[in-house]
């Protein structure tokens, strides 16, 4: 056996003995389930020429993008890390440098999938897979939102005013190269004295599994409480919906959507919360805080919720990918720590 291959085999065995998380993931999730949706968009069915380098396998490319999002890596960084890390190459089934896509290929494929809305389709595909595993409970849902930071723009005051008024699309038409680097969809906002720029991920999760069931992406200035109805589905009817104090006074909206509001109360000037209200809030928060675990995982294990791209279309694709990657890893956690939640398919 070649000495380098022998060394790699020993490294793989050592990683496995230590509990390689990507190996555990591969054993549980068959990424081939995503092939139909990926081939639909990426395979050039009318390409008859055999010249040039053959296309990379579509599932391989998605797994590269999956790794990139989970570890919060840029296009150049993911190429380097695949070359450098045995665990990445094992997960991808790659053995030689020639099999590794370069940064331009990664960007190109991700761009095609983003524009086509493919990450939404893959999220739905995996959600159906989870439903098939019995991970669909009707005991309550939780809604919350988190900022998705975007690259900050340097504009004049007049340009910012036009963007804020919704007329930013007409700016820089005489400078197309400059315009392609300008984000006219992202917005500034302030929360608890801290400024944020970019977008916002609004998510609905199941209270029992902490799996994300639906998500909506808006600019950062949209208040959390204005995105309730788009997240609620018919199957949620009659279930309790847990919300924090930021959704105060939205009881009627929740009821109109067919759910039972369970909203933490907020004290006001000259009207502080009573001891009873504080106790009620503590009880509600025991369930509501479970959604914080989701955003905590994204911020911690996935190196934050952010976009490196320009515009709402790519931001929506990025949040769809984030939610999909989170759900896949959450499914692995459930298998490991809460296997009783998974219904027997036998």
What are these regions (language model features)?
Residues 1-39, 334-346:
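Charged, often Cys/His-bearing segments associated with DNA-binding zinc-finger transcription factors
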Residues 23-66:
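Basic, short loop/linker segments at the boundary and entry of helix-turn-helix/winged-helix-like folds
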Residues 30, 52-60, 98-102, 283, ...:
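Secondary-structure capping and boundary motifs in well-ordered enzyme cores
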Residues 58-69, 84, 230, 296:
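Contiguous, well-ordered alpha-helical segments that form the cores/surfaces of helical PPI scaffolds
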Residues 80-83, 93, 101-255:
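Polybasic low-complexity intrinsically disordered regions
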Residues 89-107, 261-263, 269-276:
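Phosphate-backbone recognition surface of nucleic-acid-processing proteins
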Residues 152, 318-323, 327, 333-346:
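C-terminal domain-tail junction helix/linker
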Residues 164-166, 240, 245-320:
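Helix-centered, glycine/charged polyanion-binding patches within enzymatic domains
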């Amino acid at each position: 056996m070649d000495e380098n291959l022998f060394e790699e085999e020993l490294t793989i065995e050592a990683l496995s003995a230590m509990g390689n998380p990507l190996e555990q993931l591969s054993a549980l999730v068959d990424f081939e389930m995503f092939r139909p949706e990926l081939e639909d968009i990426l395979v050039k069915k009318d390409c008859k020429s055999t010249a040039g380098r053959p296309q990379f396998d579509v599932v391989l490319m998605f797994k590269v993008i999956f790794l990139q999002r989970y570890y919060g890596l840029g296009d150049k960084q993911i190429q380097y890390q695949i070359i450098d890390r045995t665990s990445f190459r094992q997960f991808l089934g790659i053995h030689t440098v020639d099999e590794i896509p370069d940064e331009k290929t990664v960007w190109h494929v991700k761009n095609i999938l983003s524009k086509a809305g493919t990450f939404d389709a893959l999220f739905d595909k995996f959600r159906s897979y989870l439903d098939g595993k019995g991970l669909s409970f009707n005991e309550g849902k939780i809604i919350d939102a988190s900022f998705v930071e975007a690259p900050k723009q340097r504009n004049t005051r007049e340009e910012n005013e036009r963007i804020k008024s919704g007329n930013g699309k007409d700016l820089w038409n005489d400078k197309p190269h400059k315009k392609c680097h300008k984000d006219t969809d992202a917005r500034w906002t302030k929360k608890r004295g801290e400024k944020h720029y970019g977008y916002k991920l609004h998510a609905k999760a199941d209270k029992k599994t902490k799996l994300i069931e639906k998500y909506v992406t808006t600019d950062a200035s949209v208040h959390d409480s204005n995105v309730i109805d788009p997240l609620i589905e018919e199957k949620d009817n009659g279930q309790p919906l847990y919300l924090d104090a930021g959704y105060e006074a939205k009881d009627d909206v929740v009821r109109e959507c067919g759910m039972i509001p369970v909203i933490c109360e907020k004290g006001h000037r000259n009207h502080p919360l009573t001891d009873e209200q504080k106790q009620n809030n503590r009880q509600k928060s025991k369930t509501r805080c479970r959604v914080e675990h989701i955003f905590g995982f994204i911020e911690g294990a996935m190196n934050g919720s952010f976009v490196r791209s320009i515009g709402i279309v790519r931001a929506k694709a990025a949040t769809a990918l984030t939610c999909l990657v989170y759900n896949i890893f959450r499914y692995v956690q459930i298998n490991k720590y809460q296997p009783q939640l998974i219904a027997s398919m036998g």
